[in-house]
Amino acid sequence: MARKTAAEAEETRQRIIDAALEVFVAQGVSDATLDQIARKAGVTRGAVYWHFNGKLEVLQAVLASRQHPLELDFTPDLGIERSWEAVVVAMLDAVHSPQSKQFSEILIYQGLDESGLIHNRMVQASDRFLQYIHQVLRHAVTQGELPINLDLQTSIGVFKGLITGLLYEGLRSKDQQAQIIKVALGSFWALLREPPRFLLCEEAQIKQVKSFE
């Protein structure tokens, strides 16, 4: 019986977290209240306080409970094409899948909360994603899939700007966003395969890339 009670308590806690995500997106983190979260979860305010000390702790639980689609793990055996396709799939998930979209909206639109929790979580997700991209591109270079003199740092900087724009537009508008994301990321990959001069690095940097082989 005790085990069932613990399971029910965990189920209630998760319902509160899921409800809080929706309320934070709809009302904004600063304006959301525990009463609103409780009503959305179908529980009493007391039940919320039984699991959490306050709204800040609820927010912490929301941010810790989810992995953003763009927090990818690089697997060399997956191959370059499939590794890049994973980026496309993750981007589509981030702006279309209901809960992933809500989490994206929290990280992007609510990032200036006074606690700094959302900003820190956004930085964590961004750093992990950019690390993945760096691993994919570096592996592609060492495997001969991309030019040996490709400037990885500049390429990733350009890519970061592209992804930021796609996320903002993808969350804001539904019109042909899936197609735009596919075309934009496919075009960037084609650009990396035959990069213009300003995406190429000097000979000294090429030697540094070779050292990773």
Curated annotation (Swiss-Prot):
Question: Ranges for the HTH tetR-type domain?
Answer: 10-70
Alphabetically ordered keywords of this record: DNA-binding, Repressor, Transcription, Transcription regulation
Q: Which PROSITE patterns match?
A: HTH_TETR_1, HTH_TETR_2
Q: Which residues bind DNA?
A: 33-52
Molecular function (GO) terms listed?
DNA-binding transcription factor activity; transcription cis-regulatory region binding
Keyword NAD set for record = no
What is this protein's function? Answer: In conjunction with SrpS represses the srpABC operon.
Name of the molecule in the record: HTH-type transcriptional regulator SrpR
Q: Which organism is it from?
A: Pseudomonas putida (Arthrobacter siderocapsulatus)
What gene, per UniProt, encodes this protein?
Answer: srpR
